[in-house]
Amino acid sequence: MSSIEELARANVRALTPYQSARRLGGNGDVWLNANEYPQAPEFQLTLQTLNRYPECQPVMVINRYAEYAGVTPEQVLVSRGADEGIELLIRAFCEPGKDAILFCPPTYGMYAVSAETFGVERRTAASKSDWQLDLDAIESQLDGTKVVYVCSPNNPTGNLIARDDLRQLLTLAQGKALVVIDEAYIEFCPQASTASWLAEFPHLVILRTLSKAFSLAGLRCGFTLANPEVIQLLLKVIAPYPLSTPVADIAAQALSHEGIAKMKANVAEVTTNRRWLSDILKNIPCIEEVFHSESNYLLVRFTASPSVFKTLWDQGIILRDQNKQPSLAGCLRITIGNRYECERVVAALQSLPGINA
């Protein structure tokens, strides 16, 4: 071990970084592995003040997002993607070596990575066979747990968590832990949002992003919705200038009435393509099951997923392998691209009838 490595914290030396889609690489021309929107939006910068430091919490961005989400500006914090929100909650509420977070695999990987980075215990309550919450398993681990992360729609399975279960979880956790509902994909099923519950549950926190339906993954802009007491605590640990001036400028434009209308058009296109792709995939021989999705991706179980993954990879079609996730053996996740990209996937898979593991 080098002397520099010896200086690092032991948990960081042992840490396996999150394997993001870009980190995994690939040389494709059909990128369906990161749940991005397939077409880049066009914006013109309007703020010519790059010689000045930006606002810590840009007022126009906060106000517009509050209006969009149906909350007050005091209930909104903006950050460098929702991933920073995940991290801020751990920094503000969890004592390393003492407290724990809890999440419900199979689910998004950054909850675990963020906790491990800060030396905070990671607890899991595996989802049931239908990928709904195992409330008994969660309740049995709440002592010493400060933050419970629930993703709905869940990534990578695509299902919504039952609203009655979410309410029951909030009741179980009252006075013990924050319940953080990750709504990164909520624009694809807005009726399922829990933002209206904030007045009822002071320990509810909601994560949002502009990366998915707003087609701004490269912007790195996310939001935390919570009661003002929580927001004020997070403001104590966030960086002094989390959003650059160009990011705030574009985010404000994306949250204008025109920008929100464009987002809704994106959602309509994705929903149409998802339905089309799902219906066709169900009749392809190398596919065992296409799971219902409320998001911009489909989870699919294949008869021989490693062969399928490599075959499509070699054709420049990059999917996301989910085999290492609990209960997802044989599964690949397919982002819903434009119609041409969906057709490329179908053509590649239809050439693989009767593939063997």
From Swiss-Prot:
EC number: 2.6.1.9
Pfam families found in the cross-reference section: Aminotran_1_2
Disulfide pairings: none
Matches recorded under InterPro entries: Aminotrans_II_pyridoxalP_BS, Aminotransferase_I/II_large, HisP_aminotrans, PyrdxlP-dep_Trfase, PyrdxlP-dep_Trfase_major, PyrdxlP-dep_Trfase_small
SUPFAM superfamilies found in the cross-reference section: PLP-dependent transferases (SSF53383)
Domain of life according to the entry: Bacteria
Pathway membership: Amino-acid biosynthesis; L-histidine biosynthesis; L-histidine from 5-phospho-alpha-D-ribose 1-diphosphate: step 7/9
Gene Ontology biological-process entries: L-histidine biosynthetic process
Reaction catalyzed: L-histidinol phosphate + 2-oxoglutarate = 3-(imidazol-4-yl)-2-oxopropyl phosphate + L-glutamate
Example GO molecular function: pyridoxal phosphate binding
Cofactor(s) named in the record: pyridoxal 5'-phosphate
Keywords: Amino-acid biosynthesis, Aminotransferase, Histidine biosynthesis, Pyridoxal phosphate, Transferase
PANTHER family: HISTIDINOL-PHOSPHATE AMINOTRANSFERASE, HISTIDINOL-PHOSPHATE AMINOTRANSFERASE-RELATED
HAMAP family recorded: HisC_aminotrans_2
Protein family according to the UniProt entry: Belongs to the class-II pyridoxal-phosphate-dependent aminotransferase family. Histidinol-phosphate aminotransferase subfamily.
Protein name: Histidinol-phosphate aminotransferase
Species the sequence originates in: Pectobacterium atrosepticum (strain SCRI 1043 / ATCC BAA-672)
